[in-house]
Amino acid sequence: MRINPTTSGPAVSTLEEKNLGRIAQIIGPVLDVVFPPGKMPNIYNALVVKGRDTVGQQINVTCEVQQLLGNNRVRAVAMSATDGLTRGMEVIDTGAPLSVPVGGATLGRIFNVLGEPVDNLGPVDTRTTSPIHRSAPAFIQLDTKLSIFETGIKVVDLLAPYRRGGKIGLFGGAGVGKTVLIMELINNIAKAHGGVSVFGGVSERTREGNDLYMEMKESGVINEKNIAESKVALVYGQMNEPPGARMRVGLTALTMAEYFRDVNEQDVLLFIDNIFRFVQAGSEVSALLGRMPSAVGYQPTLSTEMGTLQERITSTKEGSITSIQAVYVPADDLTDPAPATTFAHLDATTVLSRGLAAKGIYPAVDPLDSTSTMLQPRIVGEEHYETAQRVKQTLQRYKELQDIIAILGLDELSEEDRLTVARARKIERFLSQPFFVAEVFTGSPGKYVGLAETIRGFQLILSGELDGLPEQAFYLVGNIDEATAKAMNLEGESNLKK
């Protein structure tokens, strides 16, 4: 059964007299609390520790019950630093799970895992709150229609299109452009679709979170003059937070997104950067709770934790949540249990390649490794499907010929293979694109390319009509008309030099 949003948070004051416990043990972010007989809190209940530390500073720490140990003891994980806590301090059982503010009041604001604003812009309306632990929608509520979600990014829309209401994984190692791609998607979707986004910053760099916030203010996604007209709510649990906060911040963001879907009946975008850190935080908590580690040191409950989060991200008859999740791949190993478990839940994968990034091709999306369940003729149409397959065949043939080219050179190839290589190199460069959010770095204005324009461009390259143009004309341009204009400019420049 799904728990509906309430119009008030858990009333701590009314429960104070009923259910008080005391801290018995503190090990880092894990607390053991003793309660009176018969007054044990439930699993996932929020506990609050209030008081003063030894130097008189105010303490307010929220914890979440994870285990019932026996002898009237519970083990809880803290959502903030446990500095200053001492044994014997009073602990209040709130009698309910963590609840966070939801609805229009969250737009344009930055929250922590507890739903508290951290942007110094004053309090948030907390009359409507929702618990972060909820069951997934029932089968009867789900929507099964298949439709494409256009992003305006050529390589994505053509070769690995996103499903509206689906789950998409951005796979890549460190420094290949996952966060930049997410920022571009937020920008494009807010401008082209007018949709509401929720961004969950799960254990990523504080600097990146700040950069993203500033970028959103500049691009108008967050409207400083009228904050209610903003298109995104931000929830951050950064690298410096305790593992409990990092493990739950994804659920806080998801709860906010669910309200927009279920109550406001909107199409929502949920960005999670980074889903691997959610698993990593779960692994830390699992070890702190004394569970036996599983493969590669991960928690034994890895599949369950991932499934609980992912099954709530879905389309219902009221609205949809389309989720785009950055997935850090440890040591670029896709067989690691964390990315491998994530794969099972995804409708599309966008794999970022270090090789393409080294060549300067951005977005560095690997056109052969990236996949989508949507790339079927009955969903995208014959023209799109045929063009995508021919692009992949051309790039695959080029990949096969690279060893021969490296040893013998281009001249030893047949005429047909030389033509394939020339077209593949044009396609590879045409898959690059200037981003709006990267304008300050590249100096090139960003481009949003519609799906029809994308298909037309690749059809022209494959047909051989543009064989006479130099390959550098296709690098970092929007549609195919820009490439032909760039080729004319390059030709004019070379004539001037002569």
From Swiss-Prot:
InterPro entries recorded: AAA+_ATPase (IPR003593), ATP-synt_VA_C (IPR055190), ATP_synth_F1_bsu (IPR005722), ATPase_a/bsu_AS (IPR020003), ATPase_alpha/beta_chains (IPR050053), ATPase_F1/V1/A1_a/bsu_N (IPR004100), ATPase_F1/V1/A1_a/bsu_N_sf (IPR036121), ATPase_F1/V1/A1_a/bsu_nucl-bd (IPR000194)
**PROSITE patterns per the UniProt record, alphabetical:** ATPASE_ALPHA_BETA
What does the record note on quaternary structure?
F-type ATPases have 2 components, CF(1) - the catalytic core - and CF(0) - the membrane proton channel. CF(1) has five subunits: alpha(3), beta(3), gamma(1), delta(1), epsilon(1). CF(0) has four main subunits: a(1), b(1), b'(1) and c(9-12).
| Protein name per its UniProtKB record | ATP synthase subunit beta, chloroplastic
Q: Transmembrane region positions? A: none
Family note: Belongs to the ATPase alpha/beta chains family.
The gene it comes from is atpB
Q: Which transformation does this protein catalyse, written as a reaction?
A: ATP + H2O + 4 H(+)(in) = ADP + phosphate + 5 H(+)(out)
Q: What is its EC number?
A: 7.1.2.2
Where does this polypeptide localize?
Plastid, Chloroplast thylakoid membrane
Lineage, highest ranks first: Eukaryota, Viridiplantae, Streptophyta, Embryophyta, Tracheophyta
Its domain of life reads Eukaryota
Of the GO CC terms on this record, one is: mitochondrion
Keywords attached to this Swiss-Prot or TrEMBL record, sorted alphabetically, are: ATP synthesis, ATP-binding, CF(1), Chloroplast, Hydrogen ion transport, Ion transport, Membrane, Nucleotide-binding, Plastid, Thylakoid, Translocase, Transport
NCBIfam families per the UniProt record, alphabetical: atpD
